[in-house]
Amino acid sequence: LEEHVAVGYNDGEVEIFAFPSLEKRCSPEKRCDDEAISCAKYSPSGRVLAIGSHDNAIYLMDASANYRVKKKLHGHSSYVKNIDWSFDSDLLQTSCGAYEIMYWSVAEGKRYRGAQDSVESDTRWQDWSLTLGFPVMGINADGSDGTDVNAVCRSRDEGLVIVADDSGH
């Protein structure tokens, strides 16, 4: 697949651009509702784009079929804040504005109902953008309520974590 960049807008629209030329490739026919897009991430295989929305849902788009929405995942009680893919592109982990972490089976298009402990300990994630979870324990300052950290990115070799917080650190 050609490399693409996905851009989500406040009105729920998504546009796809070629990279690095930034030529517009397409706008998927179906909007992700009318709510703001809060995050987007391609699967490691590059075949699926996961979009997180302020309608509390995750949209799975088929990158090889003009970004047609394949599945819509429901379950969060607030807007979807972060999305991470497993290395094998089989699972998603997501978090939301209510600080819920959920796991999803991409093939089934459903919330993963297996043993949560085994997913957390046995799954290798392509990267880590959730502001919650074992790999990022200790990123919040003492006495923090957890809302100070706005963004996290763990390197693929799992050796570094970059954190952006309200204090500019």
What annotation goes with each model-predicted range?
Residues 1-169:
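WD40-repeat beta-propeller superdomains and closely related acidic/aromatic-rich repeat-like regions
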